[in-house]
Swiss-Prot record:
CDD domains attached to this UniProt entry: LptA
UniProt keyword list: Cell inner membrane, Cell membrane, Lipid biosynthesis, Lipid metabolism, Lipopolysaccharide biosynthesis, Membrane, Transferase, Transmembrane, Transmembrane helix
Pfam families: Sulfatase
Localization: Cell inner membrane
Protein family according to the UniProt entry: Belongs to the phosphoethanolamine transferase family. EptC/CptA subfamily.
Membrane topology: Multi-pass membrane protein
Name recorded for this polypeptide: Phosphoethanolamine transferase CptA
Function: Catalyzes the addition of a phosphoethanolamine moiety to the outer membrane lipopolysaccharide core.
Up-regulation conditions: Induced by BasR.
One GO CC term on file: plasma membrane
Source organism of this protein record: Salmonella typhimurium (strain LT2 / SGSC1412 / ATCC 700720)
Residue spans crossing the bilayer: 17-37, 45-65, 69-89, 119-139, 154-174
Pathway, per record: Bacterial outer membrane biogenesis; LPS core biosynthesis
GO annotation, biological process: lipopolysaccharide core region biosynthetic process
Amino acid sequence: MQSTLLQTKPAFSWKALGWALLYFWFFSTLLQAIIYLTGYSGTNGLRDSLLYSSLWLIPVFLFPGRIRVIAAVIGVVLWAASLAALSYYVIYGQEFSQSVLFVMFETNANEASEYLSQYFSLKIVLVALAYTVAAILLWTRLRPVYIPSPWRYLVSFALLYGLILHPIAMNTFIKHKSMEKTLDSLASRMEPAAPWQFITGYYQYRLQLASLNKLLNENDALPPLANFQDHSGDAPRTLVLVIGESTQRGRMSLYGYPRETTPELDALHKTDPGLTVFNNVVTSRPYTIEILQQALTFADEKNPDWYLTKPSLMNMMKQAGYKTFWITNQQTMTARNTMLTVFSKQTDKQFYMNQQRTQSAREYDSNVLAPFKAVLADPAPKKFIIVHLLGTHIKYKFRYPENQGKFDGKTDHVPPGLSSDELESYNDYDNANLYNDYVVASLIKDYKATDPNGFLLYFSDHGEEVYDTPPHKTQGRNEDSPTRHMYTVPFLLWTSEKWQAAHPRDFSQDVDRKYSSSELIHTWSDLAGLTYDGYDPTRSITNPQFKETTRWIGNPYKKNALIDYDTLPYGDQVGNQ
């Protein structure tokens, strides 16, 4: 009798486990594998989708005899969520994220209807059918995964502990992070897996929305600038501010770099007298949010919190009677980018062109060209347009189309001693600069084609060290170990003939002035003809009263952390520092 019972006891099957894994992985990992194989992002999403899809094995291990029912119920939820995410990727080439939720909730009913109607195409129907058939076929292959007691409980707990409980315990009790930050970190890891991209996306969206609304309400409560006057006349005009990303001028041929990385801007500079190139502008912070909190407000290194207590550039232009626009190819609703969204919401109309889940994904700045043309055609008599680019942000090869790697494999004008990976990054950065040149030049040309009355100013938020400074082993930005290339930025001004005729200025004597972009609001006010209490013409690079001052860099919130940029040692004399 005992022998018979032993023979009929169900045995563990690796094959059954394999089919169960394939089934649950299918709903998340297929999309992440496509994203990775097509070169649109790295391996993090693929890794996390594999890990967190494995959580669905727990009920399968605990109740092996009901695997078909459990898998069917869970599968319907996973199928619906993953099909929506897959369809979104097929249409837009982007992952679903909290930024998508933000854009969807910000649209009106008609826009939302148009947005959703794009799903009902023949292509999407065929994708949905194939996807559904594959899911059903995998479901039919499922068999019970028998794990003897007590191992089934131990294995199930190990999965739960390793993926959920351990990260929470480590962050909360060992690293002493708040529960909010702990859950936010866990949510970002779970996001690539269905249906967590919707659950965590909504959680993160609500979290950032609360912070966003608090900052916007505080901004709305600020008093307007006192004794405000616009001396530029009443003629219709369009003023444009283009903000780049991670672009150091030392790698631009426009500034003397031997590789031809900016051919279109080079040509414009030679042929168009309206383009002025300023040669000695630096940023105060090597990070996007931190510098824009200064460049777009009255804050600076000595008064870093004034962005919270004084009006911004966007507030100022609305006070001057401009209809204001914000066009961005940066991510929208992320913990890091909430302040950017706050700035954007201070304008009348926003265009959010990048809803990627991660910044390290293929997204091209050509996205901004169509909405820019549309805004130029807006009938408002006074328009102020901000265009925020991804520029040359790391990962550099994701900033330009794959077939436009002009400098791939090149070794000319390369620092000595670079490894093959470092050489690839060095060349990728030059390729990204080349594409950035096309985008910035296109914006200038599209603006010029409207025969505008106004000006366009372009600068990059900060620079980037890409093995430029000896010993040529540093890539990126580190405020605690600064190099000149992290802070040197392009600063270009294109003035239309109409604006120049009405407001004649000669900038030829200004181009070599030492300047910090943290003072940008004073230069912008000067160019736009705006005065008010707090405007300081000595802090405008284009004003005859300009006075050079110490260009502070560093973290203003750390004691004794500010240093004079001009005391930094020079690297190799390549390009402009």
